[in-house]
Curated annotation (Swiss-Prot):
Keywords: Isomerase, Lactose metabolism. Heteromultimeric protein consisting of LacA and LacB. Gene3D superfamilies: Sugar-phosphate isomerase, RpiB/LacA/LacB. Its EC number is 5.3.1.26. GO terms for biological process: D-allose catabolic process; galactose catabolic process; lactose catabolic process via tagatose-6-phosphate; pentose-phosphate shunt, non-oxidative branch. InterPro entries: LacB, RpiB_LacA_LacB, RpiB_LacA_LacB_sf. Pathway: Carbohydrate metabolism; D-galactose 6-phosphate degradation; D-tagatose 6-phosphate from D-galactose 6-phosphate: step 1/1. This is Galactose-6-phosphate isomerase subunit LacB. It holds the Pfam family LacAB_rpiB.
Amino acid sequence: MKIAIGCDHIVTDTKIAVSDFLKAKGYEILDVGTYDFTRTHYPIFGKKVGEAVMSNQADLGICICGTGVGITNAVNKVPGIRSALVRDMTTALYAKEELNANVIGFGGKITGEFLICDIAAAFIEAHYHPTEDNEQLIEKINQVEKQHPEQQDAHFFDEFLDKWQRGVYHD
């Protein structure tokens, strides 16, 4: 199984630790960045994880930023992605087994590294339990999605990257 993983600059070390843990368990990892601690913007990497999953470059995805809120919201904007921000095993398993989540999000400054590793492994190993109710709920969620063609523009995030460089945003 191949797992796409992405993060912002605040939690690169956590992403590397989770990647190494999953590799040791035998999973193939597609690391979409960021790769260092140079200031960047989390939506870029949420989008990359979501696109990797939806293009079948990866089976599932993991997103990590400081709180997990921003990157999980960003990945959920990719059509077809069902991501859940989790901090505990129960929520992660519910997301996968009941809602067929294909990406999981974490706050690397909120949830400890070892717990993230354990939750990620359980999420990956869990299986969706299709029921009529689950299928109907997922279909309702899918109906909310809308395609936004401007997101395909290679310069879609330039405005935000420029603001990072000018110091508008702060960690």
